[in-house]
Structures are given as structure tokens and as C-alpha cells.
Amino acid sequence: MLSIARKIFGTENDRKIRRLRPMVEKINALEPDFEALSDDALKAKTVEFRERLDKGEKLDALMPEAFAAVREAAKRALGLRPYDVQLMGGMVLHEGSIAEMKTGEGKTLVATLPCYLNALPAKGVHVVTVNDYLATRDSEWMGRVFAQLGLTTGVVAHGMTDPERRAAYACDITYATNNELGFDYLRDNMKYSTEEMVQRGHGFAIVDEVDSILIDEARTPLIISGRTEDRTEFYKTINELIPLLGEDCYEIDEKARSILLTEEGNEEIERLLNERELLAEGDLYDVENIQAVHHVNQALKAHKIFVRDKDYIIKDNAVVLIDEFTGRMMPGRRLSDGLHQAIEAKEGTDIQPENQTLASVTFQNYFRLYDKLAGMTGTALTEADEFFDIYKLAVMEIPTNKPIARIDEEDEVYRTLEEKYAAIIDEIVDCQQRGQPVLVGTASIEKSEIIDRLMSDKALFKKMLGHLYPKDEAAKAEFEKSARPVERTLPEMLKLIPIEHQVLNARYHEQEAFIVAEAGVPGAVTIATNMAGRGTDIQLGGNADMRLDAWKAEQEAAGKTPTQTEIDRQADAIKSEIAEKKRHALDAGGLYVLATERHESRRIDNQLRGRTGRQGDPGRSKFFISVQDDLLRIFAPERLDTIMRTLGMKEGEAIQHPWMSKALETSQRKVEQRNFDIRKNVLKYDDVMNDQRKAVFEQRIDFMVSDDVADVIKDMRQSTAEDLVSAHIPPKAYADQWDISGLKEALQETFGLNLPVEAWADEEGIADEEILERVSEAADKAYAEKAANAGPELMRRIEKSILLQAIDINWREHLQNLDAMRSMIGLRSYAQRNPLNEFKTEAFNLFERMMDNLRGEVTKQLMLIRFERAPAPPKEPEGLTATHIDPRTGRNEMADPGDGPVAPRVAPTQRRVSTPAHPNKPETWGRVARNAPCPCGSGKKYKQCHGAIDGAPTA
């Protein structure tokens, strides 16, 4: 019934799209008018639009003309005309929503439309990409569109200096990665003057691959940290205890990836720790022993939860983490709270010191700083509820410009892993013999290497899968009665092994570019962990640019310098060869995505499917499933076993049935909901910290902006006096209960004042309020004399410097306390208390204590300071580490470039305010990326056209 109603009335998404069409028609109607404008007149439109804004006109009213201007600028600068569906995508982004646009639909060009419109108020627009290469490429390529309209474009990339970053953020449109933006925000809040800050606010941002950044990375905070003391021997000692614990000493929750000590485990670990004198006096869970217990729990996780070659690998005597979404190495990333050190101790590698958090923020809270936020991706609808719940972002699916020709086949489900692997190898052989390129998608390094070995090793294949293959024709005839028989006998299969193939996973990251480039060649077989290199096109027939570059490198290695004529001849030969191979691949059905198991999220499955059938090309995708796969084994064992028994499946049979599809979808929904709950729970805790973070950062900036913080210092001095007096003379206490000697000592230590407190206390009828008043007067008088000796200008500078440094020191200690409390607060649930409510209460108490310490430290330093010479300006901490991983690059993007392709060093800012690009005037083109289309309109890439002729600098 519902499907019939949808056919008649359309879906909600269809109705929203229909509402956009009148605006598209308006923009199309304006096209002839803008085509008639000269380059100067087109650029002058920006000035006109800004003047109209100043007079009170709204951005929405300007949208038809602004979009028409961008369309015309794109035609002139790039030779590209945004389609109607791209205009719709731009409208959705301008509304502050997420546009789901399939891969290959031109999201990069779509972003220019809302970017231009929202840059008109001159508050800056940020375009967020997933790596430096894309930020650089897009800023240079799309920057030519903005230059045609008189706007400036900047790019922020790893390794740039603060002045370069400041210049980039000052541009109308700034391209940057999510990591650079987040860390610049944190670093700005560690600066000691507003002039040193690089960002200028958070107005409007468009996030590319928004699902990856705002969902996949939401649980991982951005952290700036510094080194702490070396505790190598402590980690080693704790590590030696874990093998001594029996299985009755702990309980493992595979779904939650957690482990807890049982009552027997608590008793045993307490005994072991006492034997090694690692416990302070008292109970195991006394405050003094929390650190030891914490490290025991982390060591348990390292031994029982984290698996080598699945969660991490050992490379160059170091533990390198593996990204759960891409299966790629993440060099530079380290687990926090001592867990990474526990894994290092387990594996016997060098143990690196822990880091202390100096500043941190999650992407969830960073991107909620923006006044308006929008996003683009090819896969967002499955997470629409989360986008709206967390970020208040609606998701709209934009129609494709050409119909999708990909065929998504039903899943094939087997009872055992061996049966599944046999069917996969059989399918791969069939495709290779027909010349169809195959991309084999796996969820982990371990799974990719199993298939790799089965395709390479005859003995292993025979040992693991031989019993599944018919031995003779009679057996084969019997076997063919099954739902999906293996088509060949064992001798036939063994003749075909080894099967030529390539492996793309964390171990072979260095070869990624070449492997991806060749994945579309007829008969190519590429094994890849959940597609490393998302955003990299697999071109049917091969990659002409890469082959030409390889040929040039061979020529140079042989000591030859090819002429331009030779290069052109070779390029034509390569293109001709690739065109022929592409026809062969298309005839065989296009790229076949063969997935070896379902991922935890339907969205990840859709990303894998999206690797084929791009831009109207034919393609095919299918998932091969086993009941023993992790997803089904953990989340749907009973239901699937019942289905299998009901259907009476035999050995080697595959099933394709609606019941099975429903069970698979139910399992994925369970995992998606669990992960959503985890992210939502993380956000609830981080919101507590975020409120405190915003309060501290905002107050800190106020102090930086202010020329005079004397009133703040006076209030702190008064509060400190009140704290000291009330601590030693409690309110409503009798005089004989006063700690006068303690007060005198505290005043001497904090204020440097030797006051006659004993005499004051002996006075008839004196009260604590009067003693406080005398202490405050004496402190104010002493401080005034100190300020007069220093001079007002020097004193104001000293006050601000000490205040800012004290805020930083206390905030870092506060973060460390919050982290420690957060890791242990879950234990309160055993006392029937709500951990979140407990965290809120404890976090507030810690914040109050931090503020008390801050006031006391600032007061003490200023009261005791000596002016022998002017103090040096405060410096930022040295030896800091910035940590966050981009799932697509598989490494800490803030570290120095490591394995794999990285972006080239970029100029600090590309300011494009000069003459717009003209096809016949190379001098107007400015800096052009090598892989961008040549501005002359030839259709070639720049490096194959004018870039190869005039030797222009490469990007």
C-alpha cells in the first residue's frame, strides 16, 4: 500500500526536489543575460550584489542571479556548465542541509554555487575536504571560477606557517581539511595575543564527504598533547601479570569491545599487585590505586580485545594501528590513556611515553561552532536521523544527471567460511577468463590476506577448500543440484592457481596509486580492504596519465630526455591502447565489485558498491556472505541458524532469500544503532566538557583583547583573601576555634605580607568579616605600591601575561583530571548511579576547584613578583603533538608525510583578483594544477597541453 502511495504522490524527497525546480527555471532564464556580459561586467556583479546586501536585501533574494553568475564564470574559466541537478545541489547546500550526490556527479563544482553566494557578506566561507591533495587541487581549480567573479581563494595545508594560514583564512573562500581547521581552532586558543590567531570566525562551512567526517570520525577527538614522564618498567610489570589471570577472572563483551574483571579477578589482581608492591595501602579501588587499576584494565584490553593484524600490525618495531573503516595503516596515531603502551608491552616493541592532553575538541562540537553548516556525500540517507539529531542537518537526495547502469545483485549466503571462499575464488576465475576487472572488497587485512594466499598457494587452497570441489563428473553432477555449485573440479582449479592479482591494504599502502590505477584493466583482480583511497577513480582500461609518467621515468632512468614530439606520440599510443582495453572491459560488463562480507554499516557497503557504475558506465556488485562472518556471528546467530535449518541448506549451497536479506539488514541496523548510541553518548559527555571549554576559551580571548585586566586581578585577589580567611576562620565558628597561626602563615605565603593577625584576633568583639576587610586593604595597598614601582604599562603587560599562562596551566591539568574521571566514572553504575549525572556533578566540582586554584596562583605570582627586569613574553609549549586520523588517507594527517600519496607543498594563498582566465591568453591563467583541465579548452589535462609546452610550474 505504501509503495503504491509513493508511486502516486512521490516520496518526501521527490516533493522537495519539485519545489526546487521553479528556482532552477529562474536561473536558466537569466543565462542569456549573463552570457552577454563582458568579463569586467561579470566581475562587477559581485560589487553590485554586495551593495544590495548592504542596503538590506537578503541572500535568498540574490540566489538566482548569484547562481547564474557562477554558472557563467564556470563556463568561461573551466569550460564546464553546471547542470540543473547541480544547481539543485547548490540550493540544498545554501539552505544548510546535506546533499547526497552519487559519485561522479560533480560535487566539487556544485560547492562553488553556495560558496560564492555566502562569501558575499565577506565573513569567509570554509570548504572542508578530506585531505591536503583535494584541498589544494580544488582551491586551484575552482579558484579560477571565483577569480572570474573577483573573489579571492586560499588553501590551508599541512606544514604551512601561521602567517601563511592567516592569509589563507583572510580570503573570501578557504579550502582546508577538517583536521587543519580543528587544530587551528585549538592552537588559536593557546595563543597569547589576537594578532597571533589565524582564524577569523566560523560563518559558513561546506563539508565534503560529510558522512565520514561527522559520523565515522565523531568518536575520535582532535588532541594537542605534550609528553609526560617515562613509565616503561611499570607497563612491562603490569603486562607480565595478565597471562597469570585465568578465564574466570574477566568477562569479555565482544559487541561493546570491553572487558571487566570479575570478583575473582579483582581478588587475584590485588594479590599480584601487592606481591610486586605496586599498590598503596588500602583497598584495590582506593583513590591512591586508581592509576594501577586503570593500567591493569588497559593491559587486559590489549591482550584480550585487540588482535594483531586486525586492529594493528607491527612495522619497524612499532605498533601501527589499522583503521576499522578502510583497513589502512595509521602511522602517527596512538591510542590514549595508556592503551597503546599496553599493546607495545604485549608485543615487546619499544614503549613510547604517554602524552598529556593540552587541548582537545571533537568534530561534533567543532563543526557546531559554525553559524551555518552544509555537507556533500554520496552516502548519507542511511544516517539521516543521526545527522538531524546531532547536527540539525536535513539530508536530501539529488537526482543523477544520467541513469545509473550498475546492477546490484542479491547477496549469496553460505553456512561456512570455507564454502564462501570457494565460491569467491570460483567467481574471480570466471571473471578473469572473461576479461572483466574485479575489485574484491574485504573488511580487514586478515581477510584480504586469506584470499591473497588462497589465490597464490596451491597447497593451502587444496588443504582449506579441496573437500568442497567435486572429484569426478558423477560427483559434479550431484553437486550441481545445489543452489549455486562450484563450477570446476579440484584439478581444474589447481591448474589455474596462482591467479594473477594485486593486494591493496595497509601493508602495501605505498603501492596504492598504481594498484588503483590498474584496477580497471580487463581481467585485473584487485583485493582491497574497505576501499582505501575513497575518492580515487578506478578508470576502465587503465590510467593514461600514470602510464605516461611511468614511461617518462623509465626514459630518464635510461639517461634519455624525450622530446615533446616523442612524448605526444607515446601519449597517443597509450590512449589508443587504453581505449581498446576500455571497450573490452565494457563488453565484459564493466568493473565487478565482489564484496567478501557485509560491513557493520549499510553506508560502508554503499560506498563499496559506488566504486563501479560511475557516470553511467555499466557495472556489477555482489556480496558473498557466510554465517560465520563477524557481523552475523555476533549480532544475528540465533535467527540465521533458524533460517538455515528451515531451508534445509546442504554443504556448498548458497541461499538467496528475502528472509536472509531481512536478517542481514536487521544485523546491520543493530550495529548502526549501537554505534549511533555510542556516538551520542560520547557527545553527551563531551558536551559537559564543551561547555567548560567554551567558557574558558571565550574568557581567555576577552582577556587577550582587553588592554587592562586590573579589575579582574583585583577580584581574584579579593576572592583569594576570602578563601584564605574562611579556611582558617570558618563562618559562625567561636574565636577559640580560629586557626590564627595558620592564617598568618598562609597570608605570608600567598601575599608576602607579615600581618598582625594575632593582635587583630585578640581585639574585643572582632569578627571574621572585619579581619577579611583588613587583609584585603593590606593586600590592595601592597599591590598598589608594587604597581606604582613598575609603572602602569609594564604592570598591565605582566598581569595579562601571568593571567593567560595560569589559565593554560590550570586548563591542562583540568583536562587530565577530566580524562581520568571519564575513564572510571562508569563504575558508578554498580552503585545504581547514573554515570552521566555523576560525571556532570564531578566535572562541575573539578571546574570550581580549577577556578579557585587559578585565582590563588595568579594572586600569589603577582603579589610575590620582583621587577628586576621586564619578563619575556609567554611562549607556546614546545614539543606538541597534534593527532587525528583521516579514514581515507589512513594516517595521522598532522604528522609529517609518511607512506602513500601526499599533497604537494602549496603556496600559502592563491589570491585570484586579477584579470579572469581567457582561453587564448595563458598569461591570465595564473597557477594551474597539472591534473586540472587546460584553460585553453582543448579537453586535455594541463600537463599534457600547455603545461608540457611552456614548462609551467607543476602543482
Curated annotation (Swiss-Prot):
Its EC number is 7.4.2.8. Disulfide bonds: none annotated. Residues 885-894 have a biased composition (Basic and acidic residues). One of its GO terms (molecular function) is ATP binding. SUPFAM superfamilies: Helical scaffold and wing domains of SecA, P-loop containing nucleoside triphosphate hydrolases, Pre-protein crosslinking domain of SecA. InterPro entries: Helicase_ATP-bd (IPR014001), P-loop_NTPase (IPR027417), SEC_C_motif (IPR004027), SecA (IPR000185), SecA_CS (IPR020937), SecA_DEAD (IPR011115), SecA_motor_DEAD (IPR014018), SecA_preprotein_X-link_dom (IPR011130). Signal peptide: none annotated. May bind 1 zinc ion per subunit. It is a peripheral membrane protein. Zn(2+) binds at C934, C936, C945, H946. One of its GO terms (biological process) is protein targeting. ATP binds at Q86, G104, E105, G106, K107, T108, D537. Pfam families: P-loop_SecA, SEC-C, SecA_DEAD, SecA_PP_bind, SecA_SW. It catalyses: ATP + H2O + cellular proteinSide 1 = ADP + phosphate + cellular proteinSide 2. The keyword Cell membrane applies. GO terms for cellular component: cell envelope Sec protein transport complex; cytosol; plasma membrane. Keywords: ATP-binding, Cell inner membrane, Cell membrane, Cytoplasm, Membrane, Metal-binding, Nucleotide-binding, Protein transport, Translocase, Translocation, Transport, Zinc. PROSITE patterns: SECA, SECA_MOTOR_DEAD. Belongs to the SecA family. Monomer and homodimer. Part of the essential Sec protein translocation apparatus which comprises SecA, SecYEG and auxiliary proteins SecDF-YajC and YidC. Part of the Sec protein translocase complex. Interacts with the SecYEG preprotein conducting channel. Has a central role in coupling the hydrolysis of ATP to the transfer of proteins into and across the cell membrane, serving both as a receptor for the preprotein-SecB complex and as an ATP-driven molecular motor driving the stepwise translocation of polypeptide chains across the membrane. This is Protein translocase subunit SecA. It comes from Maricaulis maris (strain MCS10). The gene is secA.
